[in-house]
């Protein structure tokens, strides 16, 4: 399992919270103190919280469950997409569409439409259309790519959400809560931890800090799914050996 350490988090500025006047009192137990009217997050709590979350993610990924990466603000968007793709997990990095979880039936129709347009763009259908029609379909496809491209292979509701900036992604968290889907979230000093099952106290604006969180989750997903695959191969080999040995035993 991937690990995070305090030194890397310090270097990345993960301990810097928001201005003290913007704090959320529900985060008080994670705050070490204040410096120049900026709250300082206690990284001695961040590290074990992160590792606990990674343990949970590992248990999901070992069973080939899906973790939906969510981070739509500018600082998180690129990292979320890159790391989710690297680890073979679904993601939302542009804008959360209301009902993405709670109205998944409708979202599935949009995914079908997106796949259809994708196929048309590759099989020469677009070339047979007028320039105007082709442009309209290309624009529709691009719009769908931004909104649901990251979940087109999810194949159903995710088994957990991993969220950067829980206040910014509150709609996603509420939908997950409604459906009983566990939420892992990076929570800053100005944010509300309610509705987050695995709270990771940390700066949710610094790009280097975001990279650490997201990379650790992606690495854990990759390692877990690879070890699960290796375990399956070993099981098959043992079964074959046993089958081959059976006649000799008679």
UniProtKB/Swiss-Prot annotation:
GO biological process, one term: translation
Entries under PROSITE patterns matching the protein: RIBOSOMAL_S2_1, RIBOSOMAL_S2_2
Top-level taxon of origin: Bacteria
Organism: Marinobacter nauticus (strain ATCC 700491 / DSM 11845 / VT8) (Marinobacter aquaeolei)
GO cellular component terms, A-Z: cytosolic small ribosomal subunit
Family: Belongs to the universal ribosomal protein uS2 family.
UniProt name for this protein: Small ribosomal subunit protein uS2
CDD domains reported in the protein's UniProt record: RPS2
Database matches in InterPro entries: Ribosomal_uS2, Ribosomal_uS2_bac/mit/plastid, Ribosomal_uS2_CS, Ribosomal_uS2_flav_dom_sf
Keywords: Ribonucleoprotein, Ribosomal protein
Molecular-function GO term, any one: structural constituent of ribosome
């Amino acid at each position: 399992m991937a690990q995070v350490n305090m030194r890397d988090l310090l270097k990345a500025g993960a301990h810097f919270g928001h201005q003290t006047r913007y704090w959320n009192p529900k985060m008080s137990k994670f705050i070490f103190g204040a410096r120049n009217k900026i709250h300082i997050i206690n990284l001695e709590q961040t590290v074990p919280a992160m590792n606990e979350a990674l343990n949970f993610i590992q248990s999901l990924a070992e069973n080939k469950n899906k973790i939906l990466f969510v981070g739509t603000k500018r600082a998180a968007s690129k990292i979320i997409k890159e790391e989710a793709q690297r680890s073979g997990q679904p993601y939302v990095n542009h804008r959360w569409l209301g009902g993405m979880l709670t109205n998944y039936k409708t979202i599935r129709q949009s995914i079908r439409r997106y796949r259809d347009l994708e196929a048309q763009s590759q099989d020469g259908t677009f070339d047979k259309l007028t320039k105007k029609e082709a442009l309209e379909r290309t624009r529709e496809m691009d719009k769908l790519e931004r909104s649901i491209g990251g979940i087109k292979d999810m194949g159903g509701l995710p088994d957990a959400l991993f969220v950067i900036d829980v206040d910014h992604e509150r709609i996603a968290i509420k939908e997950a809560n409604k459906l009983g889907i566990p939420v892992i979230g990076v929570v800053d000093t100005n944010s509300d931890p309610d509705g987050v099952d695995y709270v990771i106290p940390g700066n949710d604006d610094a790009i280097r800090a975001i990279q650490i969180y997201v990379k650790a989750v992606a690495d854990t997903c990759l390692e877990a799914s690879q070890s699960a695959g290796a375990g399956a191969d070993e099981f098959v080999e043992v079964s074959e050996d046993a089958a081959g040995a059976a006649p000799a035993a008679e």
